[in-house]
């Protein structure tokens, strides 16, 4: 089956695994998914991730993070720019998520960045997702 939006599939898998409190999840790997996982790790939303090489596409394993009393660290994750409706933001219009409590993942000319990194580098781009 052909996947029309692999980023939305990744975010849905993370949301579903998080809701049932799985320790980890696996999904087909790609460079953009690896970069999204790296941003989520840098911002403290996931514990870690690893890329498992096989003879095909590879598998990205993401380890979800929970607080000491089993509360979810990711309370929401939403795809913003979709294949049917792209959403772009200029450097001075990069959105804040929950007034800085969450992040926006932005695809820029400097690669994938969080909203804070995009603002500090003064670059805009396509707003891929919100995570809070």
Swiss-Prot record:
Transmembrane segments: none annotated. One of its GO terms (biological process) is translation. GO terms for molecular function: rRNA binding; structural constituent of ribosome. The keyword DNA damage does not apply. Gene3D superfamilies: 3.30.1370.30, 3.30.1490.10. Keywords: Ribonucleoprotein, Ribosomal protein, RNA-binding, rRNA-binding. InterPro entries: Ribosomal_uS8, Ribosomal_uS8_CS, Ribosomal_uS8_sf. One of its GO terms (cellular component) is ribonucleoprotein complex. Belongs to the universal ribosomal protein uS8 family. NCBIfam families: PRK00136.1. One of the primary rRNA binding proteins, it binds directly to 16S rRNA central domain where it helps coordinate assembly of the platform of the 30S subunit. This is Small ribosomal subunit protein uS8. It comes from Oceanobacillus iheyensis (strain DSM 14371 / CIP 107618 / JCM 11309 / KCTC 3954 / HTE831).
